[in-house]
Amino acid sequence: MIHIHNKNFNLAQIMDSGQCFRMNQVKPEVYDIYASDRYVRIRKDSEGYMLDCDQSAFDRFWKNYFDLETDYASYIQAIDPEDTYLSAAAAYGSGIRILRQDLWEMIITFLISQQNNIVRIRGCIQRLCEHYGALCTDSSGSVYRAFPTPEALAGAGEDALRT
């Protein structure tokens, strides 16, 4: 288990920010996050968040994905106090991180997001993964689907992707 103690990290805010669509709240204060071919369950506790992964997985992927080495507090402190608009935005979304997502996954989700709402986008992404993503297994033996590769989507054909 890895602990994140950072006041500028809030999974609920990140999940609702519209950056990614494979982050789900499965119980109060419990989140399942899928990124590329990776999965992690994260629980909120009184001190921050606990990631259900080992140090190696955290260092190789999740630390970078959540941009945890960037000091967001310093950006917030640098905002001119007289800029009420930016100050209010920073206070409202102080827990949002800029996710460092896989470029392919980000482009495809961006294209799907056009003229759609978050619920519909999540459904489209989930179906893409179910139909065209490679099978993966997490550390507990549970099976999930990776985000499909360009080759997998190209092989599906345009008609199949439209349905």
What are these language model-derived features?
Residues 1-163:
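HhH-family (HhH-GPD) DNA N-glycosylase catalytic core used in base-excision repair
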